[in-house]
Curated annotation (Swiss-Prot):
Disruption phenotype: No expression of OmpC or OmpF during growth at 0% sucrose, low expression of OmpF at 15% sucrose. Single deletion of envZ has no OmpC or OmpF at 0% sucrose, low levels of OmpC and very low levels of OmpF at 15% sucrose. Deletion of both ompR and envZ leads to loss of both OmpC and OmpF expression at 0% and 15% sucrose. This is Sensor histidine kinase EnvZ. Member of the two-component regulatory system EnvZ/OmpR involved in osmoregulation (particularly of genes ompF and ompC) as well as other genes. EnvZ functions as a membrane-associated protein kinase that phosphorylates OmpR in response to environmental signals; at low osmolarity OmpR activates ompF transcription, while at high osmolarity it represses ompF and activates ompC transcription. Also dephosphorylates OmpR in the presence of ATP. One of its GO terms (molecular function) is identical protein binding. GO terms for biological process: phosphorelay signal transduction system; protein autophosphorylation; response to osmotic stress; signal transduction. It comes from Escherichia coli (strain K12). Cross talk between this and the Che and Ntr two-component systems can occur at least in vitro. PROSITE patterns: HAMP, HIS_KIN. Residues 223-289 are annotated as: Cytoplasmic dimerization domain (CDD), when dimerized forms osmosensitive core. The gene is envZ. The periplasmic domain interacts with MzrA. The periplasmic domain assumes a PDC sensor fold. The HAMP domain by itself is intrinsically disordered. The cytoplasmic dimerization domain (CDD, residues 223-289) forms an osmosensitive core; increasing osmolarity stabilizes this segment, enhancing its autophosphorylation rate and consequently, downstream phosphotransfer to OmpR and signaling. The autophosphorylation activity of the CDD is inhibited by the angucycline antibiotic waldiomycin which probably binds to it. Changing residue 185 to L: Constitutive OmpC, no OmpF, with or without sucrose. Weakly phosphorylates but does not dephosphorylate OmpR. GO terms for cellular component: cytosol; outer membrane-bounded periplasmic space; plasma membrane. SMART domains: HAMP, HATPase_c, HisKA.
Length: 450
């Protein structure tokens, strides 16, 4: 089933929309009930009384219920005119007295015609003081009867409208506040889940709200505690394995130093293997370390890139640069970003053919740095798996490595609320670009400079 294009996504918006819809439906239903069972019967009764008044004023005789004909004296009719404020006008005089501004109502004319027994036209004039009813009956087709409704004032409807609007706004405001309170535990749960996704275990959440939400929060706290225990056990295990492995490696290195000069080539080969083992162990430790919470600070991204370029460049490796002119202030953990850039450069050196390019730049609200190589590249269908631990591309299977370098980069960038993007370099190799968020003030300034 397709979701409506403009349907709200969040539970807060959906619940608020549901309450507002139900409130509106309740108001419409109340209006229809009052209209059909109170207003329309009262209006019919009003028309009936008004019809009797008009008939009494327009005829000399009235027929009573028992059939007796009653003669209405002219003086009595004039007294009724005066008491009720009724006036008689010719067609031209009625136009000048306000008939031109009166609105014709077909249903009132139809009901009045039924009461008077002949064609009747009813118009209603709404002025600043009170409404006025104009009638022209078949009894006197050239005379308009003006009946002011002095007991009904236009201002009487304003409080009713204000009270109805106030009740509706109070109901919507109360619903909004209630839903906000109900959704607050879910917002806390969302933030905590995002932290767990980054490898940061938050403190146990406070269990409050509805019983279902409390149950979910309790289950989440149990899950987070289990994840933390698992992460701690893993870190302890890797630390123990690292210590236990480096001890025999150190003894092997000491043994190679006591080998004779004739076995120098063998000692050099053994030392290379020892260095590779140490590098693998260090990568495991780095991978575990990146899951921990890191203190952030404002730092210049270009300065961090420059330190890595200076450290990784040498007589065996030339790194081409295309850095953004000026500084790029980013909220980051400089040591972690330095580790990520170094891993990207080492990856480019290991799988490329000697050419490496490091560049940086800015866009509105974010900055980026990029490392390119001229190696065989990675097929597009394999790129989405490249950041998973221990996963390596087909072209890298013949080269030694753990498959953790880019996984470490991914973790570091995720901890900075950034994202990674793989592409093809200008020389056909692999291009890795990391995006980092930039404070709004800095992003606006960067846009002007660029």
């Amino acid at each position: 089933m397709r979701r409506l294009r403009f349907s709200p996504r969040s539970s807060f918006a959906r619940t608020l929309l549901l309450i507002v819809t139900l409130l509106f439906a309740s108001l419409v239903t109340t209006y229809l009930v009052v209209l059909n069972f109170a207003i329309l019967p009262s209006l019919q009764q009003f028309n009936k009384v008004l019809a009797y008044e008009v008939r009494m004023l327009m005829t000399d005789k009235l027929q009573l219920e028992d059939g007796t004909q009653l003669v209405v004296p002219p003086a009595f009719r004039r007294e009724i005119y005066r008491e009720l404020g009724i006036s008689l006008y010719s067609n031209e005089a009625a136009e000048e007295a306000g008939l031109r501004w009166a609105q014709h109502y077909e249903f009132l004319s139809h009901q009045m015609a039924q009461q008077l027994g002949g064609p009747t036209e009813v118009r209603v004039e709404v002025n600043k003081s009170s409404p006025v009813v104009w009638l022209k009956t078949w009894l006197s087709p050239n005379i308009w009867v003006r009946v002011p409704l002095t007991e009904i004032h236009q201002g009487d409807f304003s409080p009713l409208f204000r009270y109805t609007l106030a009740i509706m706004l109070l109901a919507i405001g109360g619903a909004w506040l209630f839903i906000r309170i109900q959704n607050r535990p879910l917002v806390d749960l969302e933030h905590a889940a995002l932290q767990v996704g980054k490898g940061i275990i938050p403190p146990p959440l406070r269990e409050y709200g509805a019983s279902e939400v409390r149950s979910v929060t309790r289950a989440f706290n149990h899950m987070a505690a289990g994840v933390k225990q698992l992460a701690d056990d893993r870190t302890l295990l890797m630390a123990g394995v690292s210590h236990d492995l480096r001890t025999p490696l150190t003894r092997i290195r000491l043994a190679t130093e006591m080998m004779s000069e004739q076995d120098g080539y063998l000692a050099e080969s053994i030392n290379k293997d020892i260095e590779e083992c140490n590098a693998i162990i260090e990568q495991f430790i780095d991978y575990l370390r990146t899951g921990q919470e890191m203190p952030m600070e404002m730092a210049d991204l270009n300065a961090v890139l420059g330190e890595v370029i200076a450290a990784e460049s040498g007589y065996e490796r030339e790194i081409e640069t295309a850095l953004y002119p000026g500084s790029i202030e980013v909220k980051m953990h400089p040591l972690s970003i330095k580790r990520a850039v170094a891993n990207m450069v080492v990856n480019a050196a290991r799988y490329g053919n000697g050419w490496i390019k490091v560049s940086s730049g800015t866009e509105p609200n974010r900055a980026w740095f990029q490392v390119e190589d001229d190696g065989p590249g990675i097929a597009p269908e394999q790129r989405k798996h490249l950041f998973q631990p221990f996963v390596r591309g087909d072209s890298a299977r013949t080269i030694s490595g753990t498959g953790l370098g880019l996984a470490i980069v991914q973790r570091i960038v995720d901890n900075h609320n950034g994202m990674l993007e793989l592409g093809t370099s200008e020389r056909g190799g692999l291009s890795i670009r990391a995006w980092l968020p930039v404070p709004v003030t800095r992003a606006q300034g960067t846009t002007k400079e660029g």
